[in-house]
């Protein structure tokens, strides 16, 4: 490791020292959260834990290059980064681990996701956009490995649209398209097809993204030799490296324990992506995983003694500690005192988070104990109900399941009784379920006045001598009107641009509105949807075209796991009103019923599924969807493009 690098102009040694020590404090805080978090899971206070220990230093370097307005699309190891940009406190970390349903205390998902899934709030309490250029932005994580990659592509492409499309409204969304989309992924997950599909698409589109690969040589118990050709992802991606004649990626490598070079590498990557709109891949090598993959097991089961010894010696937190002392920035004694203070603070944060989690549940416990006492006094089964009360009272740290199971058990003992005390208990149980609706089941769809189902119907109007035209003409003319009215609307897909889609519903629109707004793509359905999700998260109104319904299976995982859950898993704090356009449902083909519709209806709850009976209906659906804020899938009738319909006047 180099002894000292001054990366900022006019930065004095004292200022540099302050910055380094602040980074060290964040690294220690994050590590201590990981260590205590694991213990909390193993003692039963949380169901599962997956943490970012061993990845602290590169995330600190990434945070220094990450500017307000930028976006993150990462995964469940990025807690240090979120702490470094000021979007995650230690107490929120534990509130997340305990799945606290109070959004004020657990702003990542209000307890809807497992720990380690991070987000920021793009919307205010009324569902209106905040100024995203004045805050650090993180799209909401999901658990499937590599599924963050398609969305990353769209987040980056939005900057290209904002920079290059005239008359587009950038207020609250962009400052000249200068925003970078930062993605993170583990080395093992680069084996997923979604990763390679995203890499290829980003190289074609030339969008400002920086992908960090955190490489600790393992994917749970499986070594890199079983994951990656040559055991090195940046080595096999060399063909994507740009040169003087061909566009592509800038590919950088850096060791994950080398603090000065990490900072330099991330500054370089950010500048390339931001200024040149060139995608960058940073392969961060020689990282460790001190506690293994997760709380599901121990890495001593599959790592050799030699590997474990190497990890202990090359732990990035240990390395920066050694470097700080060797560079004269601080002393062993001073760092020890910092560590002691932080460990005490983390213990306090954990305690406060647990107390805050328990408090409302214990309040419900006391309410129920009082009700049980009253019911027991009036019931013929009072002896048994008193035993239920005693059982509940003995639970020091109850769950809501404990409370409701005791309450409903009491109701069973009062069957046939009509006392006011029983009625009061039943009403109390109903109120708990009603309150639970907002805690656990709200915001699957928009709950604002922008919801599509609240938009007033406008019926088509016709002249007496209305001409009969092909259905595709109605679609085409309606799309032209929409594109003229809404500069933020864009459409893209296979054969969508140059020929105006395979059924000519977009005929001539690329020539009118340009290749950025009416675009062709490669054959890559998952990242077509990812483009749409990312751009919709940034305030654009994309229409992502899947050429035929049959091909939607390639993208169904992303639609189901990411798009359909965006509003729900952020409890209404992010939205991605993407419109997916496709055609089919002819009841022909290899499928026994000729349609994937049954699976679609069940797998993408959270997305409206619309099947217009003709192209006039289809046009109306698109008009309604663009006025609202829910995502939707529109399946146009494949037989309807050449059928004659009256041309509406509106």
Question: Which role fits each region the language model picked out?
Answer:
Residues 99-108, 204-212, 517-520, 563-583, ...:
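A glycine-rich helix N-cap at a beta->alpha junction
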Residues 32-212, 217-219, 223-241, 590-592, ...:
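Cofactor-binding active-site loop characterized by glycine-rich and histidine/acidic residues
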Residues 258-283, 331-334, 384-391, 547, ...:
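Phosphate/diphosphate-binding loops
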Residues 41, 48-55, 75-77, 110-111, ...:
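Active-site nucleophile and cofactor-binding loops and adjacent substrate-binding regions
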Residues 1-58, 64-65, 290-513:
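Conserved acidic/glycine
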Residues 459-571, 593, 602, 609-610:
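Glycine- and small hydrophobic-enriched segments that form the cores of compact globular domains
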Residues 76-81, 185-191, 213-219, 255-260, ...:
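Acidic, glycine-rich active-site loops and adjacent beta-strand->loop/helix elements
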Residues 138-361, 602-650:
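Glycine-rich ThDP/TPP pyrophosphate-binding loop and its adjacent helix/strand module
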């Amino acid at each position: 490791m180099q002894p000292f690098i001054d990366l900022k102009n006019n930065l004095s040694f004292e200022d540099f020292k302050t910055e380094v020590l602040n980074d060290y404090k964040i690294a220690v805080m994050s590590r201590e959260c990981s260590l205590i978090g694991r213990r909390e899971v193993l003692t039963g206070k949380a169901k599962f834990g997956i943490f970012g220990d061993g990845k602290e230093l590169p995330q600190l370097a990434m945070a220094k290059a990450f500017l307000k307005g930028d976006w993150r699309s990462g995964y469940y190891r990025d807690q240090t980064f979120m702490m470094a940009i000021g979007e995650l406190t230690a107490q929120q970390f534990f509130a997340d681990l305990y799945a606290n349903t109070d959004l004020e205390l657990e702003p990542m998902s209000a307890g809807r996701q497992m720990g380690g899934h991070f987000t920021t709030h793009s919307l205010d309490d009324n569902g209106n956009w905040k100024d995203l250029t004045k805050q650090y932005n993180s799209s909401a994580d999901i658990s499937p490995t590599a599924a963050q990659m398609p969305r990353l592509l769209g987040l980056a492409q939005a900057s290209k649209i904002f920079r290059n499309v005239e008359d587009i409204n950038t207020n609250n969304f962009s400052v000249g398209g200068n925003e970078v989309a930062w993605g993170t992924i583990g080395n093992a997950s680069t084996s997923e097809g979604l990763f390679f599909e995203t890499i290829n698409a980003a190289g074609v589109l030339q969008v400002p993204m920086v992908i960090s690969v955190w490489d600790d040589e393992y994917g749970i118990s499986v070594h890199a030799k079983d994951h990656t050709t040559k055991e090195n992802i940046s080595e096999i991606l060399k063909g994507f490296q740009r040169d003087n004649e061909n566009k592509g990626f800038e590919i950088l490598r850096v060791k994950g324990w080398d603090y000065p070079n990490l900072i330099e590498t991330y500054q370089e990557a950010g500048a390339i992506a931001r200024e040149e709109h060139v995608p960058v891949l940073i392969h961060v090598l020689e990282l460790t995983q001190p506690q293994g993959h997760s709380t599901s097991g121990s890495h001593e089961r599959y790592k050799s003694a030699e590997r474990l010894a190497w990890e202990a010696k090359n732990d990035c937190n240990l390395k920066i500690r050694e470097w700080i002392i060797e560079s004269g920035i601080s002393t062993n004694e001073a760092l020890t005192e910092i560590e002691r203070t932080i460990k005490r603070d983390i213990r306090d944060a954990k305690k406060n988070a647990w107390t805050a989690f328990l408090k409302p549940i214990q309040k419900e416990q006391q309410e129920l104990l009082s009700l049980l006492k009253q019911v027991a006094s009036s019931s013929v089964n009072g002896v048994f109900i008193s035993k239920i009360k005693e059982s509940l009272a003995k639970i020091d740290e109850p769950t809501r399941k404990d409370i409701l199971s005791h309450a409903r058990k009491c109701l069973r003992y009062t069957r046939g009784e009509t006392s006011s005390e029983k009625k009061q208990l039943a009403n109390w149980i109903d109120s708990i379920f009603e309150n639970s609706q907002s805690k656990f089941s709200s915001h699957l769809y928009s709950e604002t006045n922008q919801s599509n189902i609240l938009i007033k119907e406008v019926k088509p109007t016709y002249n007496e001598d209305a001409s009969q035209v092909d259905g595709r003409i109605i679609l085409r003319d309606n799309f032209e009107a929409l594109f003229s009215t809404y500069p933020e609307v864009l459409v893209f897909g296979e054969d969508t641009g140059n020929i105006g889609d395979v059924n000519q519903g977009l005929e001539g629109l690329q020539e009118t509105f340009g290749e950025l707004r009416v675009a062709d793509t490669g054959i890559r359905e998952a990242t077509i949807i990812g483009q749409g999700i990312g751009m919709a998260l940034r305030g654009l109104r994309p229409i992502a075209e899947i050429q035929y319904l049959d091909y939607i299976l390639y993208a169904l995982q992303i639609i189901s796991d990411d798009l359909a859950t965006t509003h729900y898993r952020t409890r209404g704090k992010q939205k991605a009103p993407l419109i997916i356009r496709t055609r089919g449902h002819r009841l022909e083909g290899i499928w026994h019923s000729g349609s994937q519709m049954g699976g679609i209806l069940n797998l993408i709850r959270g997305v409206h599924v619309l099947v217009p009976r003709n192209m006039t209906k289809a046009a109306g659906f698109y008009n309604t969807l663009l006025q609202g804020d829910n995502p939707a899938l529109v399946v146009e009738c494949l037989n309807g493009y050449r059928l004659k319909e009256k041309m509406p006047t509106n």
